[in-house]
Curated annotation (Swiss-Prot):
The species this protein was found in: Arabidopsis thaliana
Free-text function comment from the UniProt entry: Catalyzes the synthesis of jasmonates-amino acid conjugates by adenylation; can use Ile and, in vitro at least, Val, Leu and Phe as conjugating amino acids on jasmonic acid (JA) and 9,10-dihydro-JA substrates, and to a lower extent, on 3-oxo-2-(2Z-pentenyl)-cyclopentane-1-butyric acid (OPC-4) and 12-hydroxy-JA (12-OH-JA). Can synthesize adenosine 5-tetraphosphate in vitro.
Positions bound to jasmonate: S101, H328, D329, Y330, G331
Identification of the protein by name: Jasmonoyl--L-amino acid synthetase JAR1
Regulation: Activated by GSTU20/FIP1.
Family in the record: Belongs to the IAA-amido conjugating enzyme family.
Main location: cytoplasm
Entry keyword annotation includes tRNA processing: no
Catalytic activity: a jasmonate + an L-alpha-amino acid + ATP = a jasmonyl-L-amino acid + AMP + diphosphate + H(+); (+)-7-isojasmonate + L-isoleucine + ATP = L-isoleucine-(+)-7-isojasmonate + AMP + diphosphate + H(+)
GO CC, alphabetical: cytoplasm
Keyword Coiled coil in record: yes
InterPro entries, sorted: GH3, GH3_C, GH3_M
EC number annotated for this UniProt entry: 6.3.2.52
Amino acid sequence: MLEKVETFDMNRVIDEFDEMTRNAHQVQKQTLKEILLKNQSAIYLQNCGLNGNATDPEEAFKSMVPLVTDVELEPYIKRMVDGDTSPILTGHPVPAISLSSGTSQGRPKFIPFTDELMENTLQLFRTAFAFRNRDFPIDDNGKALQFIFSSKQYISTGGVPVGTATTNVYRNPNFKAGMKSITSPSCSPDEVIFSPDVHQALYCHLLSGILFRDQVQYVFAVFAHGLVHAFRTFEQVWEEIVTDIKDGVLSNRITVPSVRTAMSKLLTPNPELAETIRTKCMSLSNWYGLIPALFPNAKYVYGIMTGSMEPYVPKLRHYAGDLPLVSHDYGSSEGWIAANVTPRLSPEEATFAVIPNLGYFEFLPVSETGEGEEKPVGLTQVKIGEEYEVVITNYAGLYRYRLGDVVKVIGFYNNTPQLKFICRRNLILSINIDKNTERDLQLSVESAAKRLSEEKIEVIDFSSYIDVSTDPGHYAIFWEISGETNEDVLQDCCNCLDRAFIDAGYVSSRKCKTIGALELRVVAKGTFRKIQEHFLGLGSSAGQFKMPRCVKPSNAKVLQILCENVVSSYFSTAF
């Protein structure tokens, strides 16, 4: 998504955003009014008692339409997937259905995808780019190294196209037209982006980037995991890539005919470039600064680096060297929410300003005790320093939909809140009175990984599970690590993991033995890649994949993969 600066009025886009955010309250009321007008014939809204005649549509909406999750909407969306063209959630048939990654619950969710969501995507890309390009100007004639993988759509039994959200965006006929004035070419041919084989596509993305190395302005993947995975793969295949460049002949590993044809057109024998890449790679110390070494004119590295992606940031920073890491914007399969308008902030500090016309937003206060539930507040009513669950209403038939994301209000951009992603609300480790979030798990792993780093070893990936097969139940943490070390070190890591969970309920439960000793389970190399392959087989896009941090019992296949690949385990002696 590299944009051509000469045809893009950066200042106008920023001015429009400033105007909209100054009037955030009015924009929210108008957005809800338009959503309800557009979908007034929807059966769901009529069942709630909305008939379009309310004198105050906003108050009527909030009093008559309940807060829901995907569970309540699933029967309605299933009818749409099955081909029911009546106005179920929207006033008109939806052109496609999106699949979520499915990593949280072990199964993908179906989510309506409409032309309005496509327009929202284009608006957010324009807004975010304006602020990004103001801080990190790019060359008009540059290219982007984008690790994009657009999986296939399939047609449901009811005749509706179904694909991941990213696939629905990239395959939408309006995408290229809408991005034309703000897009410079990707290094990779379309045949690579739409390849049915993600492994071959990744190899070709890397090769394409190096062929155009001097033109690359930034490096992008939707998620930080995708960037780290790409350059870990490069460590393994770089010599093969160098040979391809030297001889001008594509590796035999590329067997998809369309991909092979497209890539072969880019390749001619280039011994000089091959030797340059070989020299660069051989001169690096443990691959530090790999990205700027390969792409000397790159301005930054770009992708989602918050939330469940935060554990990958240290490794990504290692590859990026001195290049800035810029956090991608805030959204989900259900729709976009906010843009990064402060791109110079590090991923750890990144905040996102809500774009008031992307949907109607409410925020459900998160109770520290978890007892009772307060009423949601509006976009401009949130308070700095408080945490909320995001509730979204959009044009695609989601009404007062609890997103499950917990965010913290860091400040305001004019009158729209700037949010920091905290965690997924339902990803909580809990056995007794303990409550540990995804963020708590990340902090625990980061703390224990410091002991491992003393041995020049790193945590490649991790997940967790509540093991209640023992009495009392206990936390099981799965680690895949980059090398071998002695048992004493791993025992230290296990104890450190246990001590790092500082939730009062957990500590007291451990001390009185109502929660058992934490277990560290080390798995074989490649285990987490097997998990990714599992989700790709379910229809997830490689670019959309997120590793499940807390494996639920319903996620039986993932748990099976983890347990079958355990090579050693350790029980904490910290308490």
